[in-house]
Amino acid sequence: EERPLAVLLDGEFWAQSMPVWPVLTSLTHRQQLPPAVYVLIDAIDTTHRAHELPCNADFWLAVQQELLPLVKAIAPFSDRADRTVVAGQSFGGLSALYAGLHWPERFGCVLSQSGSYWWPHRGGQQEGVLLEKLKAGEVSAEGLRIVLEAGIREPMIMRANQALYAQLHPIKESIFWRQVDGGHDALCWRGGLMQGLIDLWQPLFHDRS
């Protein structure tokens, strides 16, 4: 089965608080998105979210080894990394890039919105751990396709994202960098989420020949 896969973090928000199904259905019918399998992962609560999302290998191993096989038995999807998007906001954006950097053979497309790349140094006076690992060459973004989005009204987040984008400059042809006129705002995120999926999956329409 070649249907692409999208893993959306904070899934209960996108399923219930700001449902994405109507717009995903519309974009698919209009052939702006390919027919795909969407997996929305519930954060449970703020305590679990703060523990599981920021750079947590155990979380992503559980997703790959336990959750995705169950999903695949119900709704088959492609194993190809270039057909797989992991998307998140805030801690979820950080987590999405972490997944792509550590398991590029599974998660080849990253959609990060307002990613918390300052983590774990909330004051913003020190570089976040993921940026440090990239600078040290401990991880590489080579081969990934990345949507990186941040709002001009979230200064600490914006600074951290700008620093990350500068570090990723050698692969800039594979990055969609967006500064949006907004803050830590779900209304901004929904539009960016849809556009990010369109951009990351656009090559699939050219593969159909």
Predicted regions located by residue number:
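Non-catalytic cap/lid and distal C-terminal segments of serine-dependent acyl enzymes
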Residues: 1-209
